[in-house]
Each structure stands twice: as C-alpha cells, then as structure tokens.
UniProtKB/Swiss-Prot annotation:
Site (Required for function): 184, 221, 244, 246
Main localisation: host cell
Location of this chain's protein in the cell: Host nucleus; Host cytoplasm
Subunit structure: Forms a complex with the DNA polymerase, the DNA polymerase processivity factor, and the major DNA binding protein.
RNA-binding listed as a keyword: yes
Origin organism lineage: Viruses, Duplodnaviria, Heunggongvirae, Peploviricota, Herviviricetes
Protein source organism: Human herpesvirus 8 type P (isolate GK18) (HHV-8)
Gene Ontology MF: a single term: RNA binding
GO biological process, alphabetically ordered: symbiont-mediated degradation of host mRNA; symbiont-mediated suppression of host gene expression
EC code: 3.1.-.-
Protein name: Shutoff alkaline exonuclease
C-alpha cells in the first residue's frame, strides 16, 4: 500500500516546493487540497487564537485571512504572488504579518472594494477551474453553484460544505462527465463565434468568491461583454450576458437510419420548427422538456418546462400550486412568458466542414424554476452583480442577462471531414459534431433571490457552528451582507 503524503502546514516556514519534491502529481494535489479552509480553522494556531481572543470571528474577514495564509504558502509554487503582495502592500501597511490575530484584525478592517480586489486576484490565479492545483482547497467551506440548490433545500446528504470530496478528473472518456467537459468548449466557441462575434468575452474563468460574505463562490462557463483590465482582473460590463453551459449526453446520436434520435433530428434539420423540435425532444424515454399545465407544480426531473398543450406527449396528473408554493409561483411568473432561442446548425458533411447557423426560431419553452440549473444561475447572477457593483472602473447603469445554453451533439462518422471549423476556429477532431443549440433566458423576481440566498446562508451558519463549535461565531455581519435583489 502506498504511503499517504504528509499534509502541508499553512503556518510552517518550510517551502512548499520542498514539501512537494519527489511526489507524484496526484500526491501533490492531495497535499495542496490539505491546505483547505477547514484545516485552517482546525489548526492549533487558529484554535489557540479562538480560545484567547475577546472577539467573535466573522465572515468574510475570516475568509480573507485564510486567503492570505493560503497564497503566502502556495503563491510561489503556482506562479501567482499577487494575492499575498496585495495584502502586504494595501492591507497590512507594507508589513508581512505572520500571526493569526494581527492578520484577522487587519482583514476585519478591509472595505468591500479591497475584498473585491482580492477576489479578482484569486479568480485570476485559479483559471482553468478544476485543473488548477488549489481548486480543491479553495472550494472548501464555500456554497458553490452546484451545491446551492442542495443548501437551500437544507438536505443532509454526502455533499458537505466543509471538507467535501475532492474533484476527480479521471472521467471515463465515453461517459457523460467527460462528454460534458469536452463538448463545453465547443459550445463556448459557438457562443463566441456565432452569437457574439463582435463582443469582448472570456472563455476561461477561475474561482469567483463572494467579496461581500465569503461563503458563496462560482466559476462561470462563458460570458459576453466581459474583459480584463491592465492587471488581468475581470471586468463585467453592466450589460454583460452570462451563460451556464449544458451538453446533453442522452441526446447524442449516430448518423444512422436505425437510430431513432437521428430520424427525429433529420426531420428537424429539414424542416426547422416547434413541431419538429418536439418530436426530437420526445425521441428518448426521459425528455428534457416537461409539459406543465397552468397553475400546476412542475417536477424537478428536467430543466425545460412548457405551458402550451402542444408539448403534451402523454397526459400525467400534476399537483396544483398552493399557497405553500408562493416563491415557486413568483419565479414561474417571471419566466413563463419568455421563449428559448433554437439554433439548428449546418451539417459539416454538406458544407465542407464549416459549421454555422442553418436556421433559428423561437420555442415556447422556459426554465424549470425547481430544477438545480435555475439555482446555479441564480447564484452566478448574485456573484456577478457583486463584482459589477464593486468595480470602480466600469459604469453602473445596465442590466446583466443570464442564460442556459444547451448543446446537442452527434457522433462522428467516417463521412465527416477530419477538419471542421466554427467560424475561423478549428473543431477538435476527437470531439463530437454539434447539431443544435438552445438558449434559454433565466429571470429572478424581486425578493426571491434574497430569500433563497438567506436560506443558504443560514444553512452555512448552522453547518459552521456544528463543525467548529470552539469558534464563538458572529453571524450578524454575514446575515447583513447577503445581497439584496436589485
């Protein structure tokens, strides 16, 4: 049995390069993951400070203190010392502080703009998302967009807030996770090249912590009207368009007459429209669309909902919306009058490898507000709007837009050109062929976002109190800094 690598110590004077010397990549990752927020709070130096301190520690000051100690330790190794340098130069008055009490005291005096600057530097240092070496450590103690739905529902499952299971990247190449990761890049190219060719965009995001409270964090898939400043920090235009990307593995088909999905897709390709789209969706046993009659409660089974009876495939009984569902009713009212944009893409076999938009039409489909995708986008909107509000280098007027962009793909065949392009960008020859893109707008009613964020924040507080009972927490600042709806 292989020996477990020795965890690193945030407070030791040992160089991290020496600690990691001779270790495999996986063991290095395990050591870096041990530098988590939970391990920081459980460290003897932090516990001693908690026992002796006459103050009640609070967020986001504690998160900022952790960021300082973490990047003091890993900054040189990952080639990013800007986070630590900003603390020293702009928060600590030019002094490199070493003890918990002094660092926390300085962090508790930081204003929101300073915290925003730190969060932007952390985002820049963690680009490439889960492939980044400190990703596992940073997501500890954070309610991310993938955990937000669970936190709001306050379920007691294995998805922990503190000390979560590490992210694994050894996905089976033919499985849905690997499919989603490789096809996500294709959807980004479709959005940047075909839908937003003249708008500044960013294709690669790091981990965006909330500067207001330190308990929420997201990483975006794609956004238009976003640029970086001279220091490489993200700047979101108030009229930016943010996309959560999904790639539907269960709709992947082969271009063969015996494939029922292909037969339905062929009809959609030849005669684009709502009826052909419905046939395509219902070509599998568990479609991505659910018909829900007016005044009925949708299930949580999939992310698209239709009110119009033309989408009904087989009649099913639905529960009625009751006064207990007022928040759901609010969210439905804000989304049910919207429509999705459907883009049918050209077949590269017919266009010498060029993939472009063959047809575009509207479909009366809206987001299911009970589905986890809705909650993911809601949390993303909250963090993006914090960054916009705290960035002194951009105008304040504008209204960000949020979407779910869903890509549909088919398997490659021997007749497909080896070299396919989307605009001027080459398509990876090992990636499936994109066939369809559906863009669904997502809206949040006034007050609903605030209530849902408060529910998640309250759950975080209870979890922190249970996990770290020796800390005399002050949650008042946290409750006061859950963002309000605009």
């Amino acid at each position: 049995m292989e020996a477990t690598p020795t965890p690193a110590d945030l407070f030791s004077e040992d160089y991290l390069v020496d600690t990691l010397d001779g270790l495999t990549v996986d063991d290095q990752q395990a050591v870096l993951a041990s530098l988590s927020f939970s391990k920081f709070l459980k460290h003897a130096k932090v516990r001693d400070w908690c026992a002796q301190a006459k103050i009640q520690p609070s967020m986001p000051a504690l998160r900022m203190a952790y960021n300082y100690f973490l990047f003091s330790k890993v900054g040189e190794f990952i080639g990013s010392e800007d986070v630590c340098n900003f603390f020293v130069d702009r928060v600590f008055g030019g002094v490199r502080l070493l003890d918990v009490a002094s660092v926390y005291a300085a962090c508790s005096q930081m204003n929101a703009h300073q915290r925003h600057h730190i969060c932007c530097l952390v985002e820049r240092a963690t680009s490439s998302q889960s492939l980044n070496p400190v990703w596992d450590a940073l997501r500890d103690g954070i309610i991310s967009s993938s955990k937000f739905h669970w936190a709001v529902k306050q379920q007691n499952t294995s998805k922990k807030i503190f000390s979560p299971w590490p992210i694994t990247n050894n996905h089976f190449v033919a499985g849905p996770l690997a499919f989603g990761l490789r096809c996500e890049e294709v959807v980004k190219t479709l959005l940047a090249t075909l839908l937003h060719p003249d708008e500044a965009n960013c294709l690669d995001y790091g981990f965006m912590q909330s500067p207001q409270n330190g308990i929420f964090g997201v990483s975006l898939d794609f956004a238009a009207n976003v640029k970086t400043d001279t220091e490489g920090r993200l700047q979101f235009d108030p009229n930016c368009k943010v996309y959560e990307i999904k790639c539907r593995f269960k709709y992947t088909f082969a271009k063969m007459e015996c494939d029922p999905i292909y037969a339905a897709y062929q009809r959609l390709y030849e005669a684009p429209g709502k009826l052909a789209l419905k046939d395509f969706f219902y070509s599998i046993s568990k479609p991505a669309v659910e018909y829900v009659g007016l005044g009925k409660l949708p299930s949580e089974s999939d992310y698209l909902v239709a009110y119009d009876q033309e989408w009904e495939a087989c009649p099913r009984k639905k529960r009625k919306l009751t006064p207990l569902h007022n928040l759901i009713r609010e969210c439905i009212l804000h989304n049910s009058t919207t429509e999705s944009d459907v883009y049918v893409l050209t077949d590269p076999q017919d266009t010498r490898g060029q993939i472009s938009i063959k047809a575009r039409f509207k479909a009366n489909l809206f987001v299911n507000v009970r589905h986890s995708y809705f909650y993911q986008v809601l949390l993303q909107s909250s963090i993006v709007e914090e960054y916009i509000g705290l960035d002194s280098g951009i105008p304040r007027l504008g209204s960000p837009k949020y979407y779910i962009a869903t890509g549909f793909f088919r398997k490659r065949g021997y007749q497909d050109p080896v070299n396919c392009t989307i605009g001027g960008d080459a398509l990876d020859p090992h990636v499936e062929i994109p066939t369809l893109l559906i863009v669904t707008p997502v809206y949040f009613p006034r007050g609903a976002k605030h209530r849902l964020l408060h529910q998640a924040a309250n759950f975080w507080s209870r979890s922190a109190k249970d996990t770290f009972p020796y800390i005399k927490w002050d949650f008042s600042y946290l409750s006061a800094n859950v963002p309000h709806s605009p």
